[in-house]
Curated annotation (Swiss-Prot):
Key word Lyase present: yes
Protein name in the entry: Anthranilate synthase component 1
Family: Belongs to the anthranilate synthase component I family.
Cofactor(s) the protein requires to work: Mg(2+)
EC number(s) per entry: 4.1.3.27
GO molecular function: anthranilate synthase activity; metal ion binding
UniProt-annotated binding residues for L-tryptophan: S50, P279, Y280, M281
Pfam family, one: Anth_synt_I_N
Cofactor: binding comment: Binds 1 Mg(2+) ion per subunit.
Catalyzed reactions per annotation: chorismate + L-glutamine = anthranilate + pyruvate + L-glutamate + H(+)
Pathway assigned to this chain's UniProt record: Amino-acid biosynthesis; L-tryptophan biosynthesis; L-tryptophan from chorismate: step 1/5
Subunit (UniProt): Heterotetramer consisting of two non-identical subunits: a beta subunit (TrpG) and a large alpha subunit (TrpE).
Binding site for chorismate: G314, T315, Y429, R449, G463, A464, G465
């Protein structure tokens, strides 16, 4: 570590900025993001990880520690609070609060070539939609806040180079003497060295060994649903009636599954990343719950004014050989129902990008390409555009939110109908996980294939896209199948990590899944 040159740069940066990064980079061999979290877990707030070797989207994992600022919504306003919970600022919109933060803290971004070097990390609940659209709130009040957390310490793990970048932001008031700046620098440098030293220590971590039982189907024993099956089937028919009447083209009806758990959220995550690896994986500690997820689908990416959405619709299980994969891909691209749904979602994405893009800049450089993931293949297109001048990147995020793949089309009418039918507010399901960088860049994924873990209960929500020729029983089964990978992860985690009998309740089992 070249501390003297770093100090010289730090003092120079302090002339123009109040929040200055100190960066140290190490190269590792056997260390993994999982081991880093285990060794530093008392301080960890989130792990954002890419885990799908066959996907070109996967390269970086990001770990956040020591929150200093939380941005959350409260009665249609956004509030910034410090680590002690003291209210610092209130604004009408998230983008206004982010702009205040940028001005207040005068943050310098580090000169390092990675997509995220620090910023706000968090989630937007699906139930945010009444503040963005004319859709009325769900009849049952949502219990979850929208929140983004800013952290002074971040670790970026580059899986391609095996470099681990430690970024420590140092906050100044702007009135320090040079001696005070040097002391502040040395204190942060010491914290960095202590953190890196911890990574050399041994950790008591139970090895995750999965055997042949990975291939067994998930059990729905002790799993309950918020939706009565008979009502779900009736609501599928209702949506088909609205489609025949011309109100909508598609509606995504969902149900929530609850299952008791006795293992930790991070143990659930460790198994999920093996059972269902995806380009967007996350373990997040929130105020009243943890989120554990493996989403395959980007919501929107904004970098230096370039916007990108990846509509996904159309799915087949992977084959066992290249030849079988090729045959399945051909069948998928010839399936008229799958193609029609995909075309509709591409049009939705073009519309979402078009609202915030320069006129004439929206394009579809990749159209209906079959991409292989670990267990499935999807039809994917890419829609791009150039952000309008003087338009905030957060406006692009809000334009795409919520994803049409989780609502149906047209979005507004579909969301209105879903709010009338679904028995509970969606909360995190169908929302997004996002990072909003200090540099204004954004990456986000749709909150699907996700567990919300609270009070020893894991909640999993899954939906089915209802179209004119949908068979109600098949749509019910589709929601059960989509929840299956996460239920399997829970049951494997209980088998591997639990030192006591699994937590049970007296709720009836869903025997029909």
């Amino acid at each position: 570590m070249n501390s003297q040159s770093n100090l010289t740069q730090f003092l120079k940066d302090s002339e123009s900025y109040k929040t200055i990064p100190i960066v140290e980079t190490i190269t590792v061999d056997t260390l993994s993001p999982i081991q880093i979290v285990e060794k530093l877990k008392q301080d960890i707030v989130y792990l954002l990880e890419s885990k799908d070797e066959s996907s070109s989207w996967s390269r970086y994992s990001f770990i956040g520690l020591h929150p200093f600022l939380t941005l959350h919504d409260d009665q249609n306003k956004y509030i910034a609070r410090d680590a002690a919970g003291q209210k610092l600022m209130q604004k009408q919109e998230l983008k206004e609060l982010l702009d205040w933060m940028k001005e207040q803290y005068q943050i310098k971004t580090p000169d390092i070539d990675i997509p995220f070097t620090g910023g706000a990390v968090g989630y937007l609940s699906y139930d945010l939609i009444p503040t963005l659209t004319s859709v009325r709130p769900h009849r049952s009040a949502s219990t979850i806040e929208n929140a983004h957390i800013c952290l002074p310490t971040m670790i970026a793990f580059d899986h391609e180079t095996n470099h681990v970048h430690f970024i420590q932001y140092t906050q100044l008031t702007g009135h320090e003497t040079e001696d005070e700046k040097i002391r502040a620098y040395k204190e942060k440098q010491k914290q960095l060295e202590q953190m890196i030293h911890k990574l050399h220590s041994k950790v008591d971590m139970k090895e995750l060994i999965l055997s042949g039982n990975m291939n067994e189907p998930p059990s729905f024993e002790h799993v309950t649903s918020t939706y009565e099956k008979a009502q779900f089937l009736k609501d599928v028919e209702k949506i088909k009636e609205y489609i025949r009447a011309g109100d909508i083209f598609q509606g995504v009806l969902s149900q929530r599954f609850d299952i008791p758990v006795s293992v930790s959220s991070f143990e659930l995550y460790r198994v999920l990343r093996i059972v269902n690896p995806s380009p967007y994986m996350y373990f997040m500690k929130l105020k009243d719950r943890d989120l554990v997820g493996s989403s395959p689908e980007r919501l929107i990416h904004a970098k230096n004014g370039h916007l990108e959405i990846h509509p996904i619709a159309g799915t087949r299980k992977r084959g066992t050989t290249r030849e079988e994969d090729a045959e399945l891909a051909r069948e998928l691209l010839e399936d008229e129902k799958e193609k029609a749904e995909h075309y509709m979602l591409v049009d939705l994405a073009r519309n979402d990008v078009g609202r915030v893009a320069e006129y004439g800049s929206v394009s579809v450089p990749t159209f209906t390409k079959v991409v292989n993931f670990s267990h499935v293949m999807h039809i994917i297109s890419i829609v791009t555009g150039k952000l309008k001048r003087d338009t905030h990147p957060v406006d692009a995020l809000m334009s795409a939110f919520p994803a049409g793949t989780l609502t149906g089309a047209p979005k507004i009418r579909a969301m209105q109908l879903l709010n009338e039918m679904e028995p509970e507010p969606r909360e995190t399901y169908g929302g997004c996980i996002a990072y909003i960088g200090f540099d204004g860049n954004i990456d986000s994924c749709i909150t699907i294939r996700t567990m919300s873990v609270k009070n020893h209960t894991a909640s999993i929500q899954a939906g089915a896209g209802i179209v004119a020729d949908s068979v109600p029983e098949n749509e019910w089964e589709e929601t059960c199948n989509k929840a299956g990978a996460l239920l399997k992860a829970i049951q494997l985690a209980e088998h591997i990590f639990s030192e006591k009998e699994s937590v049970q309740d007296e709720s009836p089992t869903i025997s029909s899944c």
